[in-house]
Amino acid sequence: MAIRKYKPTTPGRRGSSVADFVEITRTTPEKSLTRPLPKKGGRNNQGRITTRHQGGGHKRAYRLIDFRRYDKDGVPAKVAHIEYDPNRTARIALLHYVDGEKRYIIAPKDLTQGTRVESGPNADIKPGNNLPLRNIPVGTTIHCVELRPGGGAKIARSAGNSAQLVAREGSRATLRMPSGEMRFVDVRCRATVGEVGNAEQSNINWGKAGRMRWKGKRPTVRGVVMNPVDHPHGGGEGKTSGGRHPVSPWGQPEGRTRKRKASDSQIIRRRKTGKNKR
């Protein structure tokens, strides 16, 4: 993938860029692998906003992605097409299995039309093949990693992301996550070899607010520019700092306020955050 930049013919075009989509081989999805995706606008079943800054955007169909691949062990497949998916930053690959079934997977880097892929403990170590961590050599770059055996891929699924198998001892493997975090994962968990493709996606300059609206993202208004009735940071004469520690519109402290999860016990070294990133 490469980035195509526009000439500044209008203010919205100035500095904006798009993906060139050269790797895409088909523009219409496989109909049997799509489902309707109704718009919620960030509302729940009571009509109340539960997720702010969502709404509008282009109509989409959801593509069913195979994040497990267990039931296709030993069944080879051929990459029929590399396709665009509006629901994720990565590209997706349509697989035609020799038994006649078709499935989508996340397309790794360098996976091309006509490539043979397979899954299972005896699969070769090459991009697109899915194996248990106990069968993958230490040092291999992987993506679409499970956190629990049989739970489906959860880690390193977006464009350009990958994890690395750093060590393996007994029933646990050590992974270096995309964030730099180090954690233990069961060696029975599956992962796909290679890194996710479309890495240049992060370099796209969207150019104008309207392109974000096409994606279904609405404006994020700062609390300090609101009125007191709308936000705890609102009001005041002139420009103010808010006058208190950052809080949500409902007065709850913002930032890292979540309790630890049970799986946090598997973390060896946390990712660097804030000032520690430097």
From Swiss-Prot:
GO terms for cellular component: large ribosomal subunit. The keyword Ribonucleoprotein applies. Residues 28-58, 223-278 are annotated as: Disordered. It comes from the Bacteria. Residues 268-278 have a biased composition (Basic residues). Residues 43-53 have a biased composition (Polar residues). GO terms for biological process: cytoplasmic translation. Keywords: Ribonucleoprotein, Ribosomal protein, RNA-binding, rRNA-binding. One of its GO terms (molecular function) is structural constituent of ribosome. Gene3D superfamilies: 2.30.30.30, Nucleic acid-binding proteins, Ribosomal protein L2, domain 3. Pfam families: Ribosomal_L2 (PF00181), Ribosomal_L2_C (PF03947). One of the primary rRNA binding proteins. Required for association of the 30S and 50S subunits to form the 70S ribosome, for tRNA binding and peptide bond formation. It has been suggested to have peptidyltransferase activity; this is somewhat controversial. Makes several contacts with the 16S rRNA in the 70S ribosome. Part of the 50S ribosomal subunit. Forms a bridge to the 30S subunit in the 70S ribosome. Belongs to the universal ribosomal protein uL2 family. HAMAP family: Ribosomal_uL2_B. This is Large ribosomal subunit protein uL2. The lineage of its organism: Bacteria, Bacillati, Actinomycetota, Actinomycetes, Propionibacteriales. The gene is rplB.
